[in-house]
């Protein structure tokens, strides 16, 4: 009985050791959220890479799919108009969220993907009508000055800033081919936040 217990505990320890090794090796936290409203479905696949020794705390990649059965119909796929155009533009959206902690509210005036320094950048707000989404270039960083009136303030607590970067389907295909993700964020104060990690995107069915 004692030997059985010993070997059982040994196997558990080996399994846990392997599990935590894989978690550390991949360094990616995966989450899938499915939301239904009426007959429609929104599926978010979320991949989070955590950083330890920096004000830049998280890089989050999100693939969002909007499924509207009525518009999935073959006849509607070829349709035009506000609703059909919006659905075509927003049915699948790719996005990076960069989470930066500071004692100030930050704006980010530039995002640079190494290897694509000449990428075309949009700077409009993210929640927009379909005609603006049709104008999405390689990626969109939003309005860097939207919170400008708060930039001078300093707070006695941690401010969790999130920069949302929506990328086009074409640009996503390009960065998916990279071996490493090398990205630089430049804040309104000209502070640089650099990322250099293994490109985890090709490992998943995205």
UniProtKB/Swiss-Prot annotation:
Keywords: Cell outer membrane, Membrane, Signal, Virulence. It is found in: Cell outer membrane. Its main location: membrane. Residues 1-19 form the signal peptide. It holds the Pfam family BPTA. GO terms for cellular component: cell outer membrane. Virulence-associated protein essential for survival of the bacterium within the tick host and therefore within the natural life cycle of the spirochete. Belongs to the BptA family. This is Protein BptA. The gene is bptA.
């Amino acid at each position: 009985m004692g030997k059985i217990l010993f070997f059982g505990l040994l196997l558990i320890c080996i399994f846990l050791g392997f599990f935590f090794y894989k978690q550390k090796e991949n360094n990616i936290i995966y989450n899938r959220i499915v939301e239904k409203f009426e007959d429609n479905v929104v599926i978010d696949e979320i991949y989070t890479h955590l950083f330890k020794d920096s004000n830049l705390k998280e890089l989050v990649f999100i693939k969002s799919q909007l499924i509207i059965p009525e518009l999935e119909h073959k006849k509607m796929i070829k349709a035009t108009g506000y609703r059909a155009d919006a659905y075509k533009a927003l049915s699948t959206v790719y996005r990076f969220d960069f989470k930066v902690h500071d004692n100030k509210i930050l704006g980010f005036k530039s995002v640079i993907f190494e290897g694509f320094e000449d990428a075309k950048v949009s700077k409009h707000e993210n929640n927009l009508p379909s005609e603006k989404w049709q104008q999405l270039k390689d990626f969109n960083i939003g309005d860097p000055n939207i919170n400008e009136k708060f930039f001078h303030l300093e707070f006695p607590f941690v401010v969790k800033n999130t920069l949302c970067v929506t990328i086009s389907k074409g640009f996503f295909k390009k960065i998916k081919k990279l071996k490493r993700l090398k990205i630089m964020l430049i804040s309104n104060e000209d502070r640089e936040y650099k990322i250099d990690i293994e490109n985890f995107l090709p490992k998943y069915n995205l």
